[in-house]
């Protein structure tokens, strides 16, 4: 088994692994690879020519007022189901950390989707910081105007609102990817 950076020739295998690991639609998978993948650094574990695990480092900043640090947001970390429980993901993330440190990233960030994943990443040395939870149900009835925003407009509004709070500053490519899934809106 070897660990390496991904390349364009890996795309068919990476997309298949993504579908298997997350169950996303073809449209969602294609959106990531068309919009975010070109600015990301992909890492994979390969065995006998087959990609069996992958993770993508999206360059970001963690900002707080005038202060910021470079972070690599580890996104879509997955291992083929036939190869889980063998320590492959831990080794892949260690390889990614080593490579990203060479590129002068100050830290790595993750957003685990479940408590089980949070515990798993904690076992690898990741620590939780100011966790936010979202409740998509029970929102009050909309009042006023709902205005669609471009990714650039959303980025400006987000920076204005979060300026004095620690927050991730997303790249325009990542915001375009998010917008392709749901869009950005301002309520007035």
Locations of regions flagged by a protein language model:
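Amide-forming acyltransferase catalytic core, primarily the GNAT-like/NAT-type
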Residues: 124-188
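Thiolate-centered catalytic microenvironments shared by cysteine-dependent enzyme domains
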Residues: 119
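Conserved residues at beta->alpha junctions
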Residues: 5, 112, 148
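A conserved beta-strand-loop-helix scaffold within acyl/acetyltransferase catalytic domains
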Residues: 3-77, 164-188
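Conserved acetyl-CoA-binding loop-helix of GNAT-fold acetyltransferases
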Residues: 76-79, 85-98
């Amino acid at each position: 088994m070897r660990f390496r950076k991904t390349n364009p020739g890996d795309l068919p295998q990476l997309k298949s692994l993504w579908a298997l690991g997350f169950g996303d639609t073809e449209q969602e998978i294609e959106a990531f690879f068309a919009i975010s993948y070109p600015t990301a650094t992909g890492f994979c574990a390969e065995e006998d020519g087959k990609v069996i695990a992958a993770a993508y480092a999206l360059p970001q900043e963690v900002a707080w007022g005038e202060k910021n640090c470079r972070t690599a947001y580890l996104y879509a970390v997955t291992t083929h189901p036939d190869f889980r429980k063998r320590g492959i993901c831990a080794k892949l993330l260690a390889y990614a950390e080593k490579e990203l440190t060479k590129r002068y990233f100050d830290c790595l960030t993750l957003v685990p989707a479940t408590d089980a994943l949070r515990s798993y990443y904690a076992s690898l040395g990741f620590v939780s910081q100011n966790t936010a939870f979202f409740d998509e149900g029970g929102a009050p009835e909309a009042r006023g105007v709902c205005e669609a925003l471009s990714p650039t407009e959303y980025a400006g509004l987000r920076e204005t609102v979060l300026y004095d709070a620690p927050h991730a500053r997303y790249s325009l490519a990542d915001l375009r990817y998010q917008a392709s899934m749901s869009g950005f809106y301002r309520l007035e």
